[in-house]
Amino acid sequence: MKAIAVKRGEDRPVVIEKPRPEPESGEALVRTLRVGVDGTDHEVIAGGHGGFPEGEDHLVLGHEAVGVVVDPNDTELEEGDIVVPTVRRPPASGTNEYFERDQPDMAPDGMYFERGIVGAHGYMSEFFTSPEKYLVRIPRSQAELGFLIEPISITEKALEHAYASRSAFDWDPSSAFVLGNGSLGLLTLAMLKVDDKGYENLYCLGRRDRPDPTIDIIEELDATYVDSRQTPVEDVPDVYEQMDFIYEATGFPKHAIQSVQALAPNGVGALLGVPSDWAFEVDAGAFHREMVLHNKALVGSVNSHVEHFEAATVTFTKLPKWFLEDLVTGVHPLSEFEAAFDDDDTTIKTAIEFSTV
């Protein structure tokens, strides 16, 4: 079968041939439909994130997948089920407490593999196998865009944890600010638009000039575009308003600190970006004082698990059709897979199609 991989010492994905996998007991064989491309894939290709499977000279890419079960094997799945796989798997050392209690998304770095990212091959292949417990059934109507379920699930977890930090008191947020107008930021903005919290004012930070398709989406969602070149995060309260909730998806280290200044009293920020090392000066006293005297919180969040994928299938049904159409700017066949990795100002979200239902 064909697969898309990055090889050691190279910085461009290529198509390779691999044997079609055979499911072991407890696993199903899945025919891949589509696999999304995101910033993590670009980081893995560039060598800035992730790692190769032990003893292998390549890593099959892809962690945002949707497929159809072709061989249920000895599982309770059925042939024809549309499924989305989760990402984390036990490391080479075997299972650990996080996997044993079915919370692999809470495992610290080094205590897991991630398919298509670190230590385990991903889903950019014509077929893949997976244990049943890591496959989430989704409605057949979501098959075409099922590769969006994984990124939606990332925000489902972040919201769950951020909201839990405010659950000890009456918290009635009205403003939310998404930092980052990439595909994850835009998905999150759309999710906040339909969130049960009923946000009255939404904002999204970027650094692009008009005309721009992401700005068009932001404004179509009735949100305000904030250009960070004109209004840095710490100035947002003076120019717009204090924010009850902030979602950071830029990976820009200063945003973690500046978010505290932009939060309203009792507000919470969710940090999802994974930056490189960067040392800079911070008024630690002001930061500490602001957190304490105004009951603010910051929550770090990474990955997601089955319950978040299941919640994502529900959220998916609430997102406007026009939004999904505008968000996905390209679905490319395997023969033209390189186009899915293009990264320009007209590209928002892309996917590679391996087969159809």
From Swiss-Prot:
Residues engaged in binding substrate = T40, H49, E114, E150, N303
The record's section on InterPro entries has: ADH-like_N (IPR013154), Glc_1-DH_arc (IPR026583), Glu_dehyd_C (IPR031640), GroES-like_sf (IPR011032), NAD(P)-bd_dom_sf (IPR036291)
Inducing or repressing factors: Up-regulated by glucose.
Q: Which GO terms describe its molecular function?
A: D-glucose binding; glucose 1-dehydrogenase (NAD+) activity; glucose 1-dehydrogenase (NADP+) activity; glucose 1-dehydrogenase [NAD(P)+] activity; identical protein binding; NAD+ binding; NADP+ binding; protein homodimerization activity
User: Where does this protein hold Zn(2+)?
Assistant: D38, H63, E64, E150
Q: Which reactions does this protein catalyse?
A: D-glucose + NAD(+) = D-glucono-1,5-lactone + NADH + H(+); D-glucose + NADP(+) = D-glucono-1,5-lactone + NADPH + H(+)
Q: How is this protein's activity controlled?
A: Activated by molar concentrations of KCl or NaCl. Inhibited by EDTA in vitro.
As cofactor, the record names:
Zn(2+)
Q: What Enzyme Commission number(s) does the record list for this chain?
A: 1.1.1.47
- Listed GO biological process terms: non-phosphorylated glucose catabolic process
Which major enzyme category is it? oxidoreductase
Q: Give a single Pfam family match.
A: ADH_N
Which annotated residues bind NADP(+)?
Answer: N181, G182, S183, L184, R207, R208, S228, L272, G273, V274, S301, V302, N303
| Free-text remark on how the cofactor is bound | Binds 2 Zn(2+) ions per subunit. One of the zinc atoms is essential for catalytic activity while the other has a structural function, according to Ref.4. However, the crystal structures show a single zinc ion, the catalytic one.
What keywords are annotated for this sequence in UniProt?
A: Carbohydrate metabolism, Metal-binding, NAD, NADP, Nucleotide-binding, Oxidoreductase, Zinc
Family the entry assigns: Belongs to the zinc-containing alcohol dehydrogenase family. Glucose 1-dehydrogenase subfamily.
Quote the function comment for this protein. Catalyzes the NAD(P)(+)-dependent oxidation of D-glucose to D-gluconate. Displays broad substrate specificity since it is able to catalyze the oxidation of a number of alternative aldose sugars, such as D-xylose, D-galactose, and D-fucose, to the corresponding glyconate. Can utilize both NAD(+) and NADP(+) as electron acceptor, with a preference for NADP(+). Physiologically, seems to be involved in the degradation of glucose through a modified Entner-Doudoroff pathway.
Q: How does it assemble?
A: Homodimer.
State any further remark.
The reaction follows an ordered Bi-Bi kinetic mechanism, involving an ordered binding of NADP(+) and D-glucose, followed by an ordered released of gluconolactone and NADPH.
Q: What is this protein called?
A: Glucose 1-dehydrogenase
List the source organism: Haloferax mediterranei (strain ATCC 33500 / DSM 1411 / JCM 8866 / NBRC 14739 / NCIMB 2177 / R-4)
Name the encoding gene, please: gdh
